């Protein structure tokens, strides 16, 4: 029989191995910051990756995370705070969630194209220098059950609510994307 400590240790080793396998590259799009080559919890650009509540540094195990369990007005912007920023916690100090301003720069200065990669629809975002990242759709339509839009958290809280701002694109969003 395995002891609880052995089980915990083997789970920690598994998580460590998975992190090492799935470590994104930093892609220079010619903007003020570099962007990850794929999502947290993904293994390649077309993988959706893990779902997160805003300000929680580990993936959600309860399905679609819409609202954070923390008061956004209390903690403020979470960029780089490993207690709240999943990118910093999982990938290290050189990684963090983008701010509203950085997402706005991505929106304003890049070319956005609808693409299908490995059978997954999303947006190919090409920077001024010609490098690109792929953002797969991660939200399903209630009517069709198909993935039809992408919602990506920013580090910036939406003051006066229990949520944060996100970069949205696809169905029911202003083209090519919007911060909401």
Feature annotation, model-predicted:
Residues 8, 23, 28-180:
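C-terminal, surface-exposed recognition/capping segments
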Residues 1-19:
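N-terminal Sec-dependent export signals
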